[in-house]
Amino acid sequence: MAAVNTVSSLPCSKAGAAVAGGAPRPSTCSVFYPPRCWSKRSSGNGVRAQASTTETTAAPAAEVTTKVEKVSKKQVDGVVTNKYRPKEPYTGRCLLNTRITGDDAPGETWHMVFSTDGEIPYREGQSIGVIPDGIDKNGKPHKLRLYSIASSAIGDFADSKTVSLCVKRLVYTNDQGEIVKGVCSNFLCDLKPGSDVKITGPVGKEMLMPKDPNATIIMLGTGTGIAPFRSFLWKMFFEEHDDYKFNGLAWLFLGVPTSSTLLYREEFERMKEIAPERFRLDFAVSREQTNAAGEKMYIQTRMAEYKDELWELLKKDNTYVYMCGLKGMEKGIDDIMIDLAAKDGIDWLDYKKQLKKSEQWNVEVY
């Protein structure tokens, strides 16, 4: 049984999780994951050692790609939903919880891993619900909150027995000048390893990955909206499966306020090293970067630099767009596409409806 020690380098505070290996880069730490055992099978997928950051392999031989018939994600066999409901949730255990934003970041974001013992058979792109401990002001149990899953279907430990989340701690001042803390986000960010957590789900089919391994997948994320894309990208570039090998193009646009909030940056940079021809990575750091006109660099501003290329990709029937994060980015992206489509005599809003119908435009915003 093969085993590999995996180190994922994540930006975090100085008080993060245990460090493995040498000294971390400034404002980062390396989260050590237990040895991965690749004799396991998950959902029919045999997974072998692909995530090691220390081994060098020869470039693979050129492969012949074949056209894959488009199959609706929502009709894929084996996708489980609502196995666990609020009245009978699954009780998992917190295995790891570490802050992944820098000390100077505007707010805290945490990466956490929960045990599932294989009882929550989720897919990349699904969500789970979390029911925080305690009762509300009416004396009733807190309602569940949904969170996008941040790990691939086999989990961060590659044993199909864990699920990971990426959660920002919600703290704000209301109109009365009172400090308000989000119930579930603070519950999760304060969890200690060994603590129990009540989980529901999995839920959702909107954000499932396309089955076509030759597809172009454009991912647009802001903040913790990166969660489902981390799950996609781990499957594409850190794992090997008997029935799936990604040969297409993955293009990630990630928008954040500061460089200390570039979540999972070192993981993504490692993926780019592994597959430079198949993975493109563009950051938009609004408080630190500007475009040529001096405008703040939001995600739509960065996309505008590639607008013609993006439009050409969107004309193809094997291009899929996934958007996750703050709702405000939708309008900015529409504004770019309206002008581009008009040059070809196309009404963008009508065209976007067609893309949605063919499951090529997938949105999960809040």
Swiss-Prot record:
Enumerate the residues binding NADP(+).
S148, K168, T224, V256, P257, S286, R287, K296, G325, L326, E364
State one molecular function term (GO). electron transfer activity
Q: Where is the FAD-binding FR-type domain?
A: 87-209
Primary location class: plastid
Assigned keywords, A-Z: Chloroplast, Disulfide bond, Electron transport, FAD, Flavoprotein, Membrane, NADP, Oxidoreductase, Phosphoprotein, Photosynthesis, Plastid, Thylakoid, Transit peptide, Transport
What does its PTM field state? May form interchain disulfide bonds with LIR1.
A Pfam family per the record: NAD_binding_1
Q: Which residues carry this modification: Phosphothreonine?
A: T216
Cofactor(s) this protein cannot do without: FAD
Q: Which InterPro entries match?
A: FAD-bd_FR_type, Flavoprot_Pyr_Nucl_cyt_Rdtase, FNR, FNR_nucleotide-bd, FNR_plant_Cyanobacteria, OxRdtase_FAD/NAD-bd, Riboflavin_synthase-like_b-brl
**Phosphoserine: modified positions:** S185
**Protein's recorded name:** Ferredoxin--NADP reductase, leaf isozyme 2, chloroplastic
Q: From which organism does this entry originate?
A: Oryza sativa subsp. japonica
From the UniProt record, report the name of the gene that encodes this protein: LFNR2
